[in-house]
Amino acid sequence: MNREVVTMSTGNTLPPALAALASPLNDAQLNQLQQTVTQLNAQQLAWVSGYFWGLSQSNALSVPHISAGQTASAASGKLTIIFASQTGNAKGVAQALLKEAQAAGIQAQLFDASDYKGKDLAKETHVIFVASTNGEGEAPDNALALHEFLKSKKAPKLPNLKYGVLGLGDSSYQFFCQTGKDFDQFLENLGAQRLVERLDADVDYQAAATEWRKQVLSILKDELTGAAAVTSVATFAVSQTAESHYSKEQPYTASLSTSQKITGRDSGKDVRHIEIDLADSGITYQPGDALGVWYENRPQLVNALLDSVGLSGHEEVQVDGETLSLHSALTHHYEITAANPQLVAQFAELAQSEKLTSLAQDKEALREYATRTQVIDVLREEKVTLSAIQLLSLLRRLTPRLYSIASSQSEVGEEVHLTVGVVEYEYEGEQRLGGASSFLAHQLEEGAPVKVFVEHNNNFKLPSDDNAPLIMVGPGTGIAPFRSFIQERENRGAAGKNWLLFGDRTFTQDFLYQVEWQKYLKSGVLNRLDVAFSRDQHEKVYVQHRLLEQAELVWQWLQEGAYFYVCGDASRMAKDVHQALITVVEQQGGLNREQAEEYVSELRKAKRYQRDVY
């Protein structure tokens, strides 16, 4: 892929009339413009044209004069920012750094890790990596190729490179911020020099990331002076207009249209088909994107939490400079459902709990305990009274829940559909519910407001070639994006074959969207459907077993250029499917295990093997 200062890719071309004009833009700018306008409808294009005209009149895009023969890189160097992102958090931090660098007069450019060629690091002077970690220490899908290149013997020596790494992760996991640690080590091994110490940021990363960016910029101001690059200023403005003005920080207040249980009466699971009305928002999304949902904590849980530490909820606290009651802060701003190791260790110290202190000294036992308990369970381990400040110091800030979108806008218009598995279980005789899933399933009435935003996922997209075959593996709620894929392929009249592999517990109770799949089979949009219901026979059968059973056909489709998609559980299913795919390639391709692993790795690099796992 050509190196471009972009974060989206389409493969479309500019209208002939525009392409024929004598362009004052350089190649990078023209390519960025091309990839942006092809995403917009006529109304959006009209708005954008007016927006840029207004900017030109207000000199909002004015840049220092560059004389003939002088290049935009005439400053003492430039900053290259590379993001490795799975859910969009790293991308957001990288975009913020880009904007701040440009405002400081630093020439800066931004790259998706999948669009950056590792060998080009030898040409750089200053690079910042912002990297999230996927699953159990894996690099995000968009960074797999770069990650592999930098640890290989092909990577160039980098004695002239100065760098910084910001890692994003979740300390609940064993391999916390592993991808950031990897990039930091790779660059050090290649002879690069650290500008600043690596930051390993936890789930509530915003404040720490902001301070780290300030530290980086204070150093870069001394090292990178001169005019900001024309391409950087212009391309940032264009990329901003290509996105909806609604975001994680500024969500859209939509309304809940439908919350319908789609598992049977006797199912052990409650799975909901959710429809949300986006009318008049102007929000657009593509198959493969996710919807971020901001939720409120249940009043019953808030009250139980307050009671467990001897507080009334009327205490006043400061949240983001605003004075709120403690009850309101816990309802809207803090994570009070999922426990985490840091919470357990801090509460052990506050409560002087021998049991929890002993537990905190065993990392594996601590992690296991935090996984199976909720915040309320930890606080009830010891009967102590806390102040409001002490309680909030234990808690993480609330973060939105991301759900794979289960609809295509070409089919549903100004709606967005989700497939939500309600988290519900018992702990020591008491019911425990998930925060976001119970909010959507139980707390909201139809017509109630819900704050949402679209999180684009460029690492889980339909191929631009409508003739390409698709193999889609989506057990349980992992079926969601493939509903959007099939809707989109039908509406586009795509000729490519479609094969779906679905699995769950039982055929009669857990076959999600069964009627729809049968309709698509009958119409020919879906060419093949294989199912695995684990509890319908003595021996449990899962989707990976169906793959192995159909190994010859899987290999045939791959040889025909099929794209292979997996969505769902990262801890077991995705790993088992991955190993099954390698086995298929090994057996059917006549390769040894190492060669089969390399083949599958090449599929991922070519974006013919894409995963949306959690």
From Swiss-Prot:
Identification of the protein by name: Sulfite reductase [NADPH] flavoprotein alpha-component
Classification via NCBIfam families: cysJ, PRK10953.1
Binding, NADP(+): 534-535, 540-544, 576
Natural source organism: Vibrio cholerae serotype O1 (strain ATCC 39315 / El Tor Inaba N16961)
Entry similarity comment: Belongs to the NADPH-dependent sulphite reductase flavoprotein subunit CysJ family. In the N-terminal section; belongs to the flavodoxin family.
Domain of life: Bacteria
Entry EC no(s): 1.8.1.2
Oligomeric form and interacting partners: Alpha(8)-beta(8). The alpha component is a flavoprotein, the beta component is a hemoprotein.
Entries under InterPro entries matching the protein: CysJ, CysJ-like_FAD-binding, CysJ_Proteobact, FAD-bd_FR_type, Flavdoxin-like, Flavodoxin/NO_synth, Flavoprot_Pyr_Nucl_cyt_Rdtase, Flavoprotein-like_sf
